[in-house]
Amino acid sequence: MLTQVSATQADSNQASQASQALLDTLYQGHALTRSQSETLFASIVAGDMDPVAMAGMLVALKMRGETTAEITGAADALRSAAKPFPRSADSISTGVLDIVGTGGDGFNTINISTTAAFVAAAAGAKVAKHGNRGVSSKSGSSDLLTHCGIGLTMSPKAASACLDTLGLSFLFAPHYHEGVRHAVPVRQALKTRTIFNILGPLINPAKPEFMLLGVYSPKLLAPIVNVLNALGVKRAMVVYGSGLDEVALHGDTQVAELNNGDIRFYHLTPEELGVERADLNLLTGGEPSDNALITKAILQGKGEAAQRDAVAINAGCALYISGISDSVQAGTKLALATLKTGKAFDVLTQLAEASQTEAQG
């Protein structure tokens, strides 16, 4: 027994020394490799890193600027530690889509990407929406869904079944990434953005092949699209919409598009997508209960024109990326047509019923 304890202690000491050596590398201003970054972040989510050391590490990364390899390694660690999400042969064959943003853009808009997820699902995509509570807005994706009667803690097996039957499942981040809680006190104490602010969209347990990913700064377009490529994502659009982490209705959208290893950068305008541009004020959101009413109205084809179009252009780009449509313009047309049918609202009500049935069972 003593021998076992001694061996465990020795292993722990070796791991601690290895982590300290990597931290020293960071403090000297050097970048980490992907595997080195994975090692440090695995220590964080396992609860093994001292909070002071963690704070120093996060600040060192922030001050130098995180590299693609460091972000990818961090994502590797969090994905490996996540609760597994089972994928059926059907969803593996067709591929899975996520429509997600980093948050933190500073605008309190309606829940565009979450509402767009219902539209994309109704139009034929398989959407595994990974989300959390609000960061920069009053209403994050999970806040909205709760007010739509959709449970957040559906088992992975049940969520996977919804993905197959309804074309949509919602994966509540804290339900799958319990180890991230170890970083919360340090992040709160630092009161500044760190690498964790961009990791959320990169650690979907469903490991989607297709992604529409909004970022809060144009400086993130190139790093994030390269991370998605390194993580094995097949097709993606990383977008920055004139201040929003969405495809913009009020201005131009900068795009970094990934297509099976090839990356290109370009701009999109609302007019190119087939809609009229509209003032950002028309997309202002409210409390989760308010946003839930807005989402339900949009999905029933009753929303205000600007709200409808903002959702349609995001759903349209997602439909293009997932291969349902052959262009962003065709995707937007399909999204607008889908909204008129009310099928997207049917997906919402069916997902709510499924989550409530599981909760009662």
UniProtKB/Swiss-Prot annotation:
Keyword Oxidoreductase: no
Chain residues that bind Mg(2+) 2: D245, E246
Pfam families: Glycos_trans_3N, Glycos_transf_3
GO terms classed as biological process: L-tryptophan biosynthetic process
Pathway: Amino-acid biosynthesis; L-tryptophan biosynthesis; L-tryptophan from chorismate: step 2/5
Positions annotated to bind 5-phospho-alpha-D-ribose 1-diphosphate: 101, 104-105, 109, 111-114, 129-137, 141
One Gene Ontology cellular component: cytosol
Enzyme class: transferase
EC number(s) reported in the record: 2.4.2.18
Sorted UniProt keywords: Amino-acid biosynthesis, Aromatic amino acid biosynthesis, Glycosyltransferase, Magnesium, Metal-binding, Transferase, Tryptophan biosynthesis
Binding positions (anthranilate 2): R187
GO molecular function, one term: magnesium ion binding
Annotated SUPFAM superfamilies: Nucleoside phosphorylase/phosphoribosyltransferase catalytic domain, Nucleoside phosphorylase/phosphoribosyltransferase N-terminal domain
InterPro entries on file: Anthranilate_Pribosyl_Tfrase, Glycosyl_Trfase_fam3, Glycosyl_Trfase_fam3_N_dom, Glycosyl_Trfase_fam3_N_dom_sf, Nuc_phospho_transferase
Cofactor note: Binds 2 magnesium ions per monomer.
Residues noted as binding Mg(2+) 1 in the record, renumbered to the chain: S113, E246
Reactions catalysed: N-(5-phospho-beta-D-ribosyl)anthranilate + diphosphate = 5-phospho-alpha-D-ribose 1-diphosphate + anthranilate
Reported cofactor(s): Mg(2+)
Positions of anthranilate 1 binding: G101, N132
Cited function: Catalyzes the transfer of the phosphoribosyl group of 5-phosphorylribose-1-pyrophosphate (PRPP) to anthranilate to yield N-(5'-phosphoribosyl)-anthranilate (PRA).
PANTHER family: ANTHRANILATE PHOSPHORIBOSYLTRANSFERASE (PTHR43285:SF2)
Protein family according to the UniProt entry: Belongs to the anthranilate phosphoribosyltransferase family.
Subunit organization: Homodimer.
Protein name: Anthranilate phosphoribosyltransferase
Lineage per the UniProt record: Bacteria, Pseudomonadati, Pseudomonadota, Gammaproteobacteria, Alteromonadales
